[in-house]
Amino acid sequence: MIQSPTSFLIVLILLWCKLVLSCFREFIIALQQLIQVLLQIINSNLQPRLTLCHSLD
């Protein structure tokens, strides 16, 4: 009798962990995309400044 609730609890915990991991993976992917976009913006902002500095030399 004791076994079934504990096994049910274990299954519940495993499912919850799976859910958390999948959400975490989605979050990481979204974060990577955001970082890439930010890097592109920074690069596009730096490019004119770098050319400006070189033209001043």
Swiss-Prot record:
It comes from Avian infectious bronchitis virus (strain M41) (IBV). Residues 1-22 form the signal peptide. It holds the Pfam family IBV_3A. The keyword Transcription does not apply. Keywords: Host-virus interaction, Inhibition of host innate immune response by virus, Interferon antiviral system evasion, Signal, Viral immunoevasion. The keyword Signal applies. This is Non-structural protein 3a. InterPro entries: IBV_3A. One of its GO terms (biological process) is symbiont-mediated suppression of host innate immune response. Involved in resistance to IFN.
